[in-house]
Amino acid sequence: MSHASDTLVMGKIGAPYGVKGWVKITSYTDELDGIFSYTPWLVGQEGNTKEIVVDQWRTHNKGLVAKLVGVETRDDAESIKNLDISIKAQQLPQLDGDEFYWRELVGMQVVTEQGYNLGVVKELFETGANDVMLIKANLKDAFGQKERMVPYLIDQVVKKVDREAKTIQVDWDPSF
């Protein structure tokens, strides 16, 4: 069994494709076929997964299809439809010291350069212009905020990320 923090959902198994056990694949990776860079997959729902290896894959109509080891028939393929595809966190490439996976930033305290605690990173998302941190404000926030959205702009807004202390220092006006 895996703990949620030890695994990452990278995609989902879709409907059967044909009668020989092929399945459609939805990939959540930046590059559509990036999901195939990771092996084995942990297929299932949180806490109830099994390792599966991709035998073959190809693009099909702007999507992906794959033949998985042990999935031989349409019925086999139907039995895994809509299951998550996860990988172990250790399978991700190592990043340089000043680079971070978003999952590492979630849960960190965000503090201004003046020492004001803005709250905890709840999630990050893309806007097209730049990435944004959604911060859950402290219950007794002096400015009455429940949540804040702060751009994740290295050097301009984000001044320092401290993995050990689990803090992100920002140049940001807490009243905004």
UniProtKB/Swiss-Prot annotation:
Keywords: Chaperone, Cytoplasm, Ribosome biogenesis, rRNA processing. Residues 97-176 form the PRC barrel domain. It is found in: Cytoplasm. One of its GO terms (biological process) is rRNA processing. The keyword Coiled coil does not apply. Pfam families: PRC (PF05239), RimM (PF01782). It comes from the Bacteria. Belongs to the RimM family. Binds ribosomal protein uS19. This is Ribosome maturation factor RimM. The lineage of its organism: Bacteria, Pseudomonadati, Pseudomonadota, Gammaproteobacteria, Alteromonadales. The gene is rimM.
